[in-house]
């Protein structure tokens, strides 16, 4: 699903709070491909934008975008930044190339949406709850054992269906 960023924006302004958007799954996949803030027309209203280069961009690493005060604080206080190494030029180049493709070839997003629509229709036809809002299709199995068995079955059929288990999800919702 897509976070109700319009409502979160209103709340952030009402309570004088910073608005942070983690777009791990939205970059290159929803709306124009520019992420959740762009989807809602709130690009200029987000205080902290973070995301990954590893999902739709096919690279590694991530990013944080914010004003200079916030970035300076993170550079000096964030242990995960202080004790890590910079991305390699090849990884940055791969992410930039993917961004260039997304910007220059709008058919990529069109093909993705066609695939999302097809997948949603197929899941619904099998009696599995699905929506075509995003290209992520959580399918709740239940127990860890059953979920791992389904994941193994899919893998042997040539399909990557990662088993998400506790503590990532609540017990019984694998």
Can you say where each PLM-predicted feature lies in the sequence?
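Short secondary-structure boundary/hinge segments and terminal tails
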Residues: 28-30, 92, 140-141, 171-173
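Conserved PLP-binding catalytic core of the aspartate aminotransferase-like
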Residues: 110-117, 124-157, 173
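Active-site core of PLP-dependent enzymes with the aminotransferase class I/II
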Residues: 1-15, 31, 146-147
């Amino acid at each position: 699903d897509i976070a109700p960023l319009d409502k979160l924006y209103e709340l952030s302004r009402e309570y004088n709070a910073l608005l942070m958007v983690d777009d791990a799954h939205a970059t290159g996949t929803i709306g124009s491909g520019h992420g959740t803030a762009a989807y809602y027309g709130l690009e200029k209203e987000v205080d902290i934008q973070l995301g990954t280069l590893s999902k739709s961009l096919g690279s590694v690493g991530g990013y944080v975008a914010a004003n200079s005060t916030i970035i300076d604080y993170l550079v000096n206080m964030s242990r995960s930044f202080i004790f890590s190494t910079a991305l390699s030029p090849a990884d940055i180049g791969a992410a930039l190339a993917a961004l260039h493709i997304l910007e220059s070839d709008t058919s990529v997003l069109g093909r993705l949406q066609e695939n999302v629509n097809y997948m949603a229709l197929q899941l619904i036809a099998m009696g599995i709850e699905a929506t075509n809002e995003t290209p992520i299709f959580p399918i709740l199995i239940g127990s860890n054992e059953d979920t791992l068995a389904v994941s193994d079955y899919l893998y042997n059929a040539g399909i990557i269906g990662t088993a998400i288990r506790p503590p990532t999800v609540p017990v019984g919702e694998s």
